[in-house]
């Protein structure tokens, strides 16, 4: 806890931007062949799914905001350092594109998961392009869920609590499926409360 708080206290947005070469990022314009839909099973494929969702989002022409809500475990996903770097780079590309992110955090996570999430997200909060939320009350501890939407892509996922390795993710860019998923993430956002307000000045 003290280490995370120290990192937050010492954080400097300008230093962070220089460290990851954010200002030199270029959003790709060359079309990539991405699947219209795909199923993902197991931790390795789920990591691929997270990155594929970000690719769909960055490469699409849509400037609609992202809606992210996930109470899946994060520690086992983050154990792959290469994935963690690619994921944070993908989020940086989303922000570089100019998109806004609405994220609903699971504040009932184990402390280790919470600290890991905060250390990764706090620097990105400082861009002013992220609005963090949370859901009040103790949530369902039997099932874990994931709901992501952007302008032209959506991803859903579920697993039994304690069995993340057998989770199932589904990514789609089919318009009618994306619309349904977007409505669900908007419903979730209406039930959520603002976690913090970000001021750049």
Report each predicted region and the residues it spans:
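PLD-like (HKD) phosphodiesterase/transphosphatidyltransferase domain
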Residues: 2-103, 187-201
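Generic structural signal of hydrophobic/aromatic residues within well-ordered alpha-helices
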Residues: 4, 54, 118-121, 181, ...
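A structural signal for short, well-ordered beta-strand segments and their strand-loop junctions
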Residues: 66-69, 100-105, 133-134, 147, ...
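Short acidic, S/G/P-rich loop/turn micro-motifs used as interaction or catalytic elements
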Residues: 70-85, 106-115, 138-140, 161
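HKD-type phospholipase D/PLD-like phosphodiesterase module
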Residues: 104-144
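Noncatalytic linker/hinge segments flanking ATPase motor cores
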Residues: 107-113, 141-150, 175-179, 193-200
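HKD (HxKxxxxD) catalytic microenvironment of the phospholipase D
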Residues: 134-178
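Signature of lipid phosphatidyltransferase scaffolds
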Residues: 161-201
């Amino acid at each position: 806890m003290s280490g995370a708080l120290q990192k937050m206290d010492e954080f400097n947005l300008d230093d962070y931007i220089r460290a990851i070469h954010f200002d030199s990022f270029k959003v790709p314009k060359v079309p990539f062949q991405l699947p219209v839909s795909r199923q993902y099973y197991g931790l390795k494929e789920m990591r691929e799914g997270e990155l594929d969702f970000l690719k769909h989002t960055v490469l699409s022409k849509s400037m609609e905001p992202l809606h992210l809500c996930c109470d899946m475990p994060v520690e086992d996903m983050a154990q792959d350092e290469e994935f963690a770097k690619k994921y944070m780079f993908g989020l940086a590309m989303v922000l570089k594109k100019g998109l806004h992110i609405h994220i609903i955090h699971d504040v009932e996570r184990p402390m280790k998961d919470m600290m890991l999430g905060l250390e990764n997200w706090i620097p990105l909060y400082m861009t002013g392009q992220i609005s963090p939320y949370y859901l009040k009350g103790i949530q369902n501890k039997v099932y874990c869920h994931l709901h992501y939407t952007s302008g032209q892509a959506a991803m859903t996922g579920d697993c039994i609590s304690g069995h993340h390795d057998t989770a199932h993710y589904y990514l789609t860019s089919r318009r009618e499926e994306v619309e349904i998923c977007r409505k669900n993430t908007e419903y979730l956002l209406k039930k959520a409360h603002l976690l913090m307000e970000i001021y750049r000045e």
